[in-house]
A protein has these predicted regions:
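Conserved structural scaffold segments of CAZyme catalytic domains across common CAZy folds
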Residues: 1-87, 97, 239-273, 283, ...
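Short, flexible, glycine/charge-rich loop motifs used to bind or transfer phosphoryl groups or to couple energy/partner
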Residues: 26, 105, 279-281
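Aromatic- and carboxylate-enriched substrate-binding clefts and catalytic-loop regions
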Residues: 35-219
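Composition- and surface-driven signal marking solvent-exposed, interaction-prone regions
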Residues: 128-129, 303-308, 368-369
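Active-site-proximal substrate-binding groove within the catalytic cores of carbohydrate-active enzymes
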Residues: 134-331, 341-356
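C-terminal beta-strand-rich structural cap/linker in extracellular carbohydrate-active enzymes
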Residues: 333-385
């Protein structure tokens, strides 16, 4: 899933403008967003203030309801999600039924893809756990693939109906909820030493790579999230991508598009030896492996990549392996014999993404030059570079 979490207490006009931005990103750079998720204040508010208690505000924010938003999202192949609380069922049967109908209607009428249950919007009373379970069951009749994020909440018997947990209870909100443990060139050094979810579990969430608080080197953080941890919502960003410079927009799009092209095989991951770099991971299907690694030091680092089972690569019939660098720029590094060792240079405090694949299935690409991808077609093929 390519996901964005955005917009605290937004409005219809603001949301339509934001979706227009992602239409531009799709048309200009080939980036496809799967889920656009509203933050708190677009259904439930903070401090246990549920939608039924703030209908006047919601009517002002969305005078036409969610229909124009859902339609605009659908036009660009996207679905909606929203933050909220797990309760809101009140103390009487009428309020309980209205709350359930509200949540079910989001899936039935607007095809919502995501509910984020956050403690900021309130907790779940024990006596309402059964009603929560019933509501989630009814919602999934209309959105069978509904993702329910659990942010720091005890849900009791409702726990199995949540899709994810918040990894380490920490949001990837730079300099707000997470920061560097040591001096570095930029504010995202923590990316390299943060670790991986135990067992490379994918049904977890890290709140998305926050752009609002720190745009610099978002791409390295996003690579570790999307190709390293590869959580269910990856690649996931949080905040305001329009804060990025114009020259950074194709970088964002390229990460989303490359991940989308190979997402079916990226679900298979393995941890690499420490010699490959901090928390390095290899993902793929044996014929094509993507290695995500980084450098958390002030010096250049040479990573020796063994082109064999050490990185999960099966032996090709041809005996040849193609090696492509995808980040921090794109470059065809050559074709080598299976079992050879290739040295990859990783810059200080930067991430690197390397593809190692059977030579016979390597994608056509320019040789003898380094470049940046500007646009990918819907099938993932690159048709514009610089």
């Amino acid at each position: 899933r390519g996901t964005l979490v955005c917009a605290v207490g937004s409005t219809e006009a603001q949301t339509l403008t934001n979706l227009e931005f992602f239409k531009f990103m799709r048309d200009r750079f080939g980036m496809q967003l799967d889920i656009y998720a509203w933050d708190a204040g677009n259904l439930d508010g903070s401090g246990g203030l549920y939608a039924a208690q703030r209908m006047d505000a919601l009517t002002k924010q969305y005078p036409n309801g969610y229909r124009p938003i859902a339609d605009a999202a659908a036009e660009i192949g996207c679905r909606l999600g929203v933050w909220g609380g797990p309760d809101g069922y009140g103390d009487d049967p009428k309020t309980e039924a209205e709350r359930q109908e509200l949540l079910v209607s989001l899936c039935r009428d607007y095809h919502f893809a995501l509910f984020k249950l956050d403690g900021v919007c309130g907790g779940l009373r024990e006596e309402k756990q059964a009603k929560f379970v019933e509501t989630m069951q009814k919602c999934r009749k209309y959105s069978p693939d509904l993702i329910v994020l659990n942010h720091r909440l005890p849900l009791g018997i409702g726990e199995p109906y949540a899709t994810t947990f918040l990894w380490n209870g920490t949001e990837t909100y730079v300099d707000v909820h997470i920061c560097n443990p040591k001096t570095a060139m930029h504010h995202r050094e923590f990316t390299f030493t943060r670790g991986n979810v135990p067992g490379l579990e994918r049904l977890a969430e890290d709140h998305g790579v926050c752009i609002s608080s720190c745009p610099e080197y978002f791409e390295d953080d996003l690579l570790y999230q999307a190709f390293g941890r590869e959580l269910i919502l990856a690649p996931e960003i949080y905040g305001n991508p329009w804060f990025l410079r114009d020259d950074e927009l194709p970088i964002l799009a390229s990460i989303y598009s490359l991940h989308r092209k190979y997402r079916a095989i990226l679900v298979h991951g393995m941890l690499l030896p420490d010699s490959y770099g901090p928390n390095a991971v290899s993902r793929g299907d044996g014929t094509r492996q993507f290695l995500c690694t980084g450098n958390d030091s002030w010096n250049m680092r040479l990573v020796k990549v063994k082109l064999d089972a050490e990185i999960g690569l099966e032996k090709p019939e041809s005996g040849k392996v193609s090696v492509i660098l995808h980040h921090p720029y794109t470059e065809f590094l050559g074709t080598f014999a299976y079992g050879e060792t290739v040295e990859i240079q990783v810059y200080p405090f930067r991430a690197a993404l390397v593809e190692c694949c059977h030579a016979e299935i390597a994608e056509d690409m320019p040789k003898d030059c380094a470049y940046r991808v500007i646009h990918r077609q819907t099938n993932g093929c690159v048709d514009e570079i610089e």
